[in-house]
Regions:
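Loop-to-helix "switch" segment enriched in basic
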Residues: 169, 226-317, 425-426
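Walker A/P-loop phosphate-binding element recognition
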Residues: 1-139, 155-163, 174-179, 186, ...
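A eukaryote-biased feature capturing mid-to-C-terminal, repeat/solenoid-rich segments of large proteins
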Residues: 229-244, 255, 384-427, 445, ...
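Short, well-ordered secondary-structure microsegments
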Residues: 319-326, 410, 424, 428-501
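Amphipathic alpha-helical segments of the small helical/lid subdomains adjacent to P-loop NTPase cores
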Residues: 150, 179-222, 236-237
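Residue register of alpha-helical TPR repeats
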Residues: 374, 471, 510-515, 553, ...
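C-terminal boundary/linker of central alpha/beta nucleotide-binding cores
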Residues: 61, 161, 203-206, 309-406, ...
């Protein structure tokens, strides 16, 4: 049954999925039957479970597309783990789902540090789904702690999830568990990928190959790629090669060792790896373990990959290994050419060849039409092991540095297109890599935002390319606000990264600036207690660096938070400290502002004489500055103060 097309003109958030689809009729029927069951007081949850390579994501996408027309309020998609096993926090997923839903960014989009159901973005998502019929696809859920905070009480919504293992703690779910394809579906898949004549002329060989692959779609696709690369080989040869114990690619450890290395901090001996994302990332004992789901060496998927990898040209094999360094393992000709250091046309051709060999999954194109590809999670762990054995650490570090510098140039070029007043691009990229219009620049920045943030986080996490990472952070902080859709949470993450690098590098002035920006973002959405903590920390760093303007700004920030929290006594004290510092710096505009703020704090304490004195002092400063508009505003404030004092006198007289 063909899925129904999306509404004309509606953005499609779902992955592209494979062009050729066969089988899974029983599983689709089970999902459809489960979808129409009455919801028990909350949104219906369907779970598709299967081992890596079972085709769970493609089944989920096909099923969701077939139901999309029944959910008029939209289809939402979020991937809750990366191919490297990185676990996406539920708050981050909720923010992206809110954006797809069209919710206006606000306080809920700024992290509070809370995890789980109380995370503001999760609360906002559940509220936004109330009264709507929305279909959500949550792909590659690692644990119920990711899923539970996203589930609302709206029975009109349907949530479809995919996972490699059981999701304990979620009630009333009956997972659809995927095994291999049935024999006709496996033969149809091979026929469509290899060529009908070649398969139909050897049905016995096709059956043997399907059995050797355990009829798993991913293994069948890899062996189809091997057969296309070996036009003289018979189908029975493919089955024989796969069944025979083949040596692993040079230096490759088992995939389970790769997963252990990822979880334990790099190489399997527990030492820190300098070769990329396998650098030390030990999880706390009570935290969910992040890492790719291991594929055993005895799995047909491992054997099929080994056969196909050994047949690759050296340049394509190197690119495939280096793509494990791409943010979220998603690459296009811009990032791939930077990672391997080749011209863009060569990178584009290599990416296409790897996708044709079923070694990369093709994703939806970027906003400007650039083709994009993803390293499948089922292959990631083994590719990391191949990279660590075949590529020197210095080569890997150089590839990562080239990628960061390429991203800096792309972000800067996007900023120049969005803000022509910033001047022309001083170092334009080669033609195939360029963004050509402001619309392309804005779409690229918004569409690649998570990948850009991930690239910074990867670099900062490994602590060896802080200079390049810092330049990318600066470029993003300048460019993202120009898109008009820069979420506070994204800016918050960037300033947190600046803070981490500054503290690690012993740069208190930069740390103070980052903390001030974090405090400003928190206070802008009313998170006053968290903002006050940031301002106090900024004050400590500013004092360490003798940065008096930053000290004054931090003091004023703490005062504003105290005022908003209903503590005028502390507010007046903090305002007074900031005022003294601004006066010593000769900042008269800030002096007038702080005098007025101090007067307001005195008024809240019913200390009317002190308030009147501060207002008049502020007026005198503004008179010297020639600020007539400011003086008029203060005159109005003084008039309100006099009316309040008069009202108090009348009240006391009447009593």
């Amino acid at each position: 049954m063909d899925p129904r097309p999306a509404e004309p003109g509606a953005p499609d958030p779902l992955p592209a999925g494979p062009a050729l689809w066969t089988g899974r009729r029983a599983e689709l029927a089970a999902l459809r039957a489960a979808a129409v069951r009455p919801a028990q007081g909350r949104c219906q949850v369907l779970v598709i479970a299967g081992r890596p390579g079972s085709g769970r994501t493609s089944l989920a996408v096909r099923f969701v597309r077939s139901l999309a027309a029944d959910y008029p309020d939209g289809v939402l998609f979020a991937r809750l783990s990366a191919p490297d096993g990185g676990r996406v926090p539920p708050g981050q997923a909720a923010r992206r789902l809110l954006e797809q839903l069209g919710a206006v960014p606000g306080a809920a989009l700024l992290p509070l540090g809370a995890e789980g159901e109380d995370e503001p973005a999760c609360v906002a998502l559940r509220e936004a789904l109330a009264g709507k019929r929305v279909l959500l696809l949550l792909d590659d859920v690692r644990d119920s702690g990711q899923l539970s905070p996203l589930l609302g009480d709206e029975p009109g919504c349907l949530v479809v999830t995919t996972t490699a293992g059981p999701l304990t703690g979620i009630e009333d779910i009956d997972p659809v568990i995927l095994g291999g394809l049935d024999q006709p579906a496996a033969a149809e898949l091979l026929s469509g990928l290899v060529g009908g004549t070649r398969i139909s002329c050897d049905p016995v060989g096709a059956a043997e190959l399907a059995e050797a692959c355990a009829a798993r779609p991913a293994a069948l696709r890899l062996m189809a790629g091997w057969l296309r690369d070996s036009p003289k080989a018979a189908v029975t040869d493919a089955a024989r090669e796969l069944a025979a114990p083949a040596p692993a690619p040079p230096g490759a450890a088992g995939a389970s060792d790769a997963a252990d290395a990822k979880r334990g901090g790099g190489k399997a001996d527990g030492r820190r790896s300098k070769s990329g994302p396998t650098a030390e990332t030990k999880a706390a004992p009570d935290e969910p373990v992040a890492g790719p789901v291991p594929v055993p060496d005895t799995d047909p998927l491992s054997g099929a990959f080994t056969l196909l990898y050994r047949s690759l040209p050296a340049a394509q094999a190197r690119m495939l290994r280096m793509l494990t360094l791409a943010p979220a393992q998603l690459a296009d000709l811009r990032t791939a050419s930077a990672l391997v250091g080749c011209p863009a046309p060569e990178a584009a051709a290599a990416l296409q060849k790897l996708a044709e060999r079923e070694l990369l999954d093709q994703e939806l194109p970027a906003h400007d039409g650039t083709l994009r590809y993803r390293v499948p999670g089922r292959l990631y762990a083994r590719l990391v092991q191949l990279r660590e054995s075949a590529d020197r650490p210095a080569e890997v570090q150089l590839a990562r540095a080239r990628l960061l510098e390429r991203l800096v140039r792309l972000v800067d070029s996007a900023r120049m297109l969005l803000d022509p007043s910033a001047g022309p691009v001083t170092d334009p990229l080669p033609g195939p890599l360029r963004l050509r219009t402001a619309a392309q620049a804005s779409g690229w920045l918004v569409g690649e935002r998570d990948l850009l943030l991930g690239a910074v986080a990867d670099a900062i996490g490994q602590a060896d390319l802080d200079g390049s990472a810092g330049r990318l952070v600066t470029a993003l902080l300048r460019a993202l606000p120009l898109t008009g859709t820069a979420a506070p949470a994204d800016l918050y993450r960037l300033h947190e990264m600046v803070l981490k690098v500054a503290e690690r590098g012993g740069a208190p002035r930069r740390a103070a600036a980052a903390l001030l920006n974090l405090g400003d973002l928190q206070s802008a959405v009313g998170h006053w207690e968290q903002a006050a903590d940031r301002y106090r920390a900024a004050l400590d760093h500013a004092r360490d660096s003798a940065d008096e303007p930053a000290c004054a700004r931090a003091l004023e920030g703490v005062a504003e938070c105290s005022r908003a929290l209903g503590d005028p006594v502390r507010a007046a004290d903090w305002y007074g400290r900031a005022l003294a510092l601004r006066q010593s710096l000769g900042d008269h505009a800030a002096e007038a502002r702080l005098l007025a703020r101090t007067a307001e704090a005195h008024t809240a304490q019913r200390r009317f004489e002190e308030a009147d004195r501060e207002y008049r002092a502020a007026q005198a400063v503004l008179r010297r500055l020639g600020d007539e508009r400011g003086r008029a505003a203060l005159a109005a404030a003084l008039e309100r103060l006099r009316e309040q004092v008069e009202g108090e006198r009348e009240r006391l007289t009447s009593e």
